[in-house]
């Protein structure tokens, strides 16, 4: 007979074994040609495999390999000569919104041992002119969001990745159209959506002006500033003020708005190096003109990505993550698009 303490020890071991066996795991590998002539032919196949013992419901995040519909910064590419310039899109995407909506098309479900392969055309996202013809290492982003099966809450996991190497020569960049309008214009927008966009542009203009006025008159630490940009320093404050000043220099009534995107989980996207056009997607039309994650706020978010405005990144999505970023890494918070949006929306209001 086992003693009580022995039985408890064995029971604990069993629980530990169950916990270990249920641990999620992913591996990610790339395949493609060993050499490529012209970057328009630079394609890789990314294969994601569930290496754990539990089924994973993974979000089709546009910044992960599970989505190839947007030319996002999904890969780290480097050579002895350096790295190519990223010339693709920055997308406003909220994982919490996607989990709450819970549409089947928003997820990829992988049972243990199951794999999925997604093809990516990298020439649409990277310009190799500066780094030149060379042998390049390509490594995919390892971060994935999934729905925790125990809590139904958003969780994240990093996959074990394998890189791919290829030689690139020939034409090193894909040409892309640029637009810098002098008045508001539309592409593929119904009259109803044009009316909605006039209101959204006006809201964004008000947000930008109010934010600039606030920052100009508050040159010390405030609750609102600290919440979204972290501990106050004059240098970081100057950076944020400059970004809102640049937004005012390019009024939202002068942009081209493109309504041809049909992705329901995405709010909007832009090509940061191609100033002038903001592409609006499904989630944009489902939100409100003002308030949290609003249409006006989305235009603040997207315009901040433009290189000539602020050149922001997408280090964190959503209010909770943006607040955490401000606290833990203010240097990234002042370069994160959602932090500018939430500061401008100021909802709930802070002084």
Swiss-Prot record:
Means of activity regulation: Inhibited by chelating agents such as imidazole, alpha,alpha'-bipyridine, and 1,10-phenanthroline.
Family: Belongs to the peptidase M35 family.
Active-site residues, as the UniProt record annotates them: 302
The species this protein was found in: Armillaria mellea (Honey mushroom)
Cofactor(s) in the UniProt record: Zn(2+)
SUPFAM superfamilies: Metalloproteases ('zincins'), catalytic domain
Known EC number: 3.4.24.20
Propeptide: 23-183
Cofactor note: Binds 1 zinc ion per subunit.
GO cellular component, one term: extracellular region
Cell location: Secreted
Signal peptide: 1-22
Comment on pH dependence: Optimum pH is 7-7.5. Active from pH 5.25 to pH 9.
Catalytic activity: Preferential cleavage in proteins: -Xaa-|-Lys- (in which Xaa may be Pro)
PANTHER family reported for this sequence: NEUTRAL PROTEASE 2-RELATED, PTHR37016
Official protein name in the record: Peptidyl-Lys metalloendopeptidase
Annotated keywords: Cleavage on pair of basic residues, Disulfide bond, Hydrolase, Metal-binding, Metalloprotease, Protease, Secreted, Signal, Zinc, Zymogen
Highest taxon in the source lineage: Eukaryota
Disulphide linkage map: 189-259, 261-281
Predominant subcellular localization, coarse grouping: secreted
Higher taxonomy: Eukaryota, Fungi, Dikarya, Basidiomycota, Agaricomycotina
Site (Transition state stabilizer): 317
């Amino acid at each position: 007979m086992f003693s009580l303490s022995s039985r408890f020890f064995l029971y604990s071991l069993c629980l530990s074994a169950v916990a270990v066996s249920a641990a999620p795991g992913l591996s990610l590998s790339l395949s493609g040609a060993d050499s490529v002539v012209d970057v328009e032919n630079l394609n890789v196949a990314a294969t994601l495999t569930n290496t754990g013992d539990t089924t994973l419901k993974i979000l089709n995040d546009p910044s992960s390999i599970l989505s190839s519909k947007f030319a996002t910064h999904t890969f780290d590419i480097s050579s002895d000569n350096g790295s190519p310039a990223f010339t693709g899109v920055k997308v406003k995407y909220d994982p919490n919104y996607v989990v709450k909506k819970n549409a089947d098309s928003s997820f990829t479900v992988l049972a243990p041992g199951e794999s999925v392969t997604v093809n990516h055309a990298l020439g649409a996202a990277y310009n190799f002119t500066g780094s030149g013809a060379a042998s390049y290492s390509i490594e995919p982003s390892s971060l994935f969001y999934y729905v925790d099966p125990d809590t139904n809450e958003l969780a994240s996991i990093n996959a074990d990745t394998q890189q791919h190497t290829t030689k690139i020569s020939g034409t090193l960049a894909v040409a892309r159209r640029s637009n810098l309008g002098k008045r508001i214009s539309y592409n593929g927008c119904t009259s109803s959506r044009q009316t909605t966009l006039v209101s959204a542009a006006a809201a964004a203009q008000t947000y930008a002006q109010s934010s600039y006025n606030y920052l100009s008159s508050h040159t010390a630490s405030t609750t609102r500033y600290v919440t979204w940009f972290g501990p106050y320093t004059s240098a970081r404050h100057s950076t944020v003020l400059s970004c809102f000043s640049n937004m005012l220099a390019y009024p939202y009534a002068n942009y081209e708005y493109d309504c041809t995107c049909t992705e329901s989980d995405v709010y909007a996207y832009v090509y940061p190096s191609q100033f002038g056009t903001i592409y609006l997607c499904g989630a944009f039309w489902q939100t409100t003109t003002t308030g949290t994650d609003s249409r006006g706020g989305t235009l603040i978010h997207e315009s901040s990505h433009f290189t000539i405005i602020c050149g922001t990144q997408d280090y964190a999505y959503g209010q909770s993550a943006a607040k955490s970023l401000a606290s833990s890494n203010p240097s990234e918070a002042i370069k994160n698009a959602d932090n500018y949006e939430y500061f401008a929306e100021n909802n709930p209001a802070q002084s």
